[in-house]
């Protein structure tokens, strides 16, 4: 059984005991988090169910930062060069339970 959840403007396909990296959530390490925006999940015979009341419970493993992305701007023949870096804050979650409340 898997679920498709949405958080941080992105969609993730998750199963129980999966580890995912998502955009930063305001939660401390070890805390349980409930993700209530479930788009779809599968039933007994792997049929897709679209439900409004489902939720996914996850525990926070760590708060970290993603790899650095380099931004480089240049205008030719004008000696204009700008180099900048960015590291996005991430939250690592372990999916503990998929709640199907039909």
UniProtKB/Swiss-Prot annotation:
Q: Which domain of life is it from?
A: Bacteria
Q: Which Pfam families match?
A: Ribosomal_L21p
Q: Which InterPro entries match?
A: bL21-like (IPR028909), bL21-like_sf (IPR036164), Ribosomal_bL21 (IPR001787), Ribosomal_bL21_CS (IPR018258)
A Gene Ontology annotation in the biological process aspect, one of them, is: translation
Alphabetical UniProt keywords: Ribonucleoprotein, Ribosomal protein, RNA-binding, rRNA-binding
The molecular function terms of the Gene Ontology recorded here are: rRNA binding; structural constituent of ribosome
An example Gene Ontology cellular component term from the record?
ribosome
- What this chain does, per the record? This protein binds to 23S rRNA in the presence of protein L20.
Subunit details for this protein?
Part of the 50S ribosomal subunit. Contacts protein L20.
**In which family does this protein belong, per the annotation?**
Belongs to the bacterial ribosomal protein bL21 family.
State what protein this is by name: Large ribosomal subunit protein bL21
């Amino acid at each position: 059984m898997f679920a498709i959840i949405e958080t941080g403007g992105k969609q993730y396909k998750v199963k129980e005991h999966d580890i995912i990296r998502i955009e930063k959530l305001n939660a401390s390490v070890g805390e349980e988090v409930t993700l209530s925006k479930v788009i779809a999940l599968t039933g007994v015979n792997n049929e897709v169910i679209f439900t409004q009341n489902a939720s996914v419970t996850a525990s926070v493993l760590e708060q970290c930062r993603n790899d650095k992305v380099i931004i480089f701007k240049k205008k030719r023949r004008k000696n204009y060069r700008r180099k900048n870096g960015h590291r996005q804050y991430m939250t690592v979650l372990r999916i503990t339970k998929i709640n199907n409340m039909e």
